[in-house]
UniProtKB/Swiss-Prot annotation:
Keywords: Cytoplasm, Endonuclease, Hydrolase, Metal-binding, Nuclease
Record-linked Pfam families: eRF1_1, eRF1_2, eRF1_3
Protein name: Protein pelota homolog
Example of a GO MF term: endonuclease activity
Record-level GO BP terms: nonfunctional rRNA decay; nuclear-transcribed mRNA catabolic process, no-go decay; nuclear-transcribed mRNA catabolic process, non-stop decay; ribosome disassembly; RNA surveillance
Annotated compartments: Cytoplasm
Domain remarks: The N-terminal domain has the RNA-binding Sm fold. It harbors the endoribonuclease activity.
Enzymatic class: hydrolase
Organism: Methanothrix thermoacetophila (strain DSM 6194 / JCM 14653 / NBRC 101360 / PT) (Methanosaeta thermophila)
EC number, UniProt record: 3.1.-.-
Subunit relationships: Monomer.
Purpose: May function in recognizing stalled ribosomes, interact with stem-loop structures in stalled mRNA molecules, and effect endonucleolytic cleavage of the mRNA. May play a role in the release non-functional ribosomes and degradation of damaged mRNAs. Has endoribonuclease activity.
Gene Ontology cellular component terms for the protein in this record: cytoplasm
Family: Belongs to the eukaryotic release factor 1 family. Pelota subfamily.
Amino acid sequence: MRVIKRNLRGDEGEISLVAESLDDLWHLKHLVSPGDLVFATTQRKISGATDKLRPEKAERRTVRLGISVEAVEFHTYSNWLRIHGVIKSGVDIGSYHTLNIEAGSELSIIKRWRPDELQRIEEAVAESNRPRVVLALVEEGEATIGVLRQFGVQTVAEIRGGSGKGSGSSVRDDFLKEVADQIANSAGDDAYVVLAGPGFTKEDLRKVMEARYPDLLKRLTMDDASSTGRSGFQEVLRRGTVDRIVEASRISRETRLMDDLMKEIATDGRAAYGIREVREAANYGAIETLMIVDQLVRRGDVESLIRDVAAGRGRVVIFSTEFEPGERLEALGGVAALLRFRIPGAS
């Protein structure tokens, strides 16, 4: 994400952004809220005064519109962010329109900004300068390949093949070649690759990659995992391999924060969870790190909590419920905190 203009008075005003990736569209989903004013270049059918009786003559033109947002829709598989609302600036004022935002789109958002939203923008800008990471998990006859996004690991391929046991070694060779090709395709010219899995299959796959894609080896890191699939992705993230490659990825950070939280809860330590307990900790000025699932940040009591914690120099981390750490936090009520000191009745 790139910030191209920032014009704020206090916490209100305009920020103009360029969405550079699918991750940025996901961030924008959480930055744009109903009631915000959003400007972007878009396509719209424009009818002249003489064309009103013949709507088929309406011409689709490129125009810049400002809309008052009513709904925001984003699906990771679509590569589009759809912002729907009423036109407030430009042609056909008062009519409804949907802005389709994709990677490369520029838009301006005018609103009252929460501290966590401004922090999210800073994180998105920082993340855009970090390398991409592909996670490849392989065991006999089975492989799962995912791309690490800021909202979680996006599975891009699941491959099944022969193990070579009873079906001939050529079947196994074909399987390994197919997996190697998919990894190379996903990695492109710049992504780092973490290759993991149980047993020695990953070592055999590495040899195939060395023969077929020797230039990729300098970007490849080997690791262990007990299985393929989602649980395997989570295991690799917990081991810290991704952190060593990308410094501190969002998902690895969320996983570690949740692990720290659960340790503190288990030992009756410096932790609070649930809105009532966390609000009490905020009143004491005890919150070091506030952890909230993304689905709750626009709720009134949570929004005021975020502002109070930010004012007290606490850190605010918004968790995605699309991945396992966010699901764990959601099970605790969606709100928790690591504390500077214990407070009466916490945990």
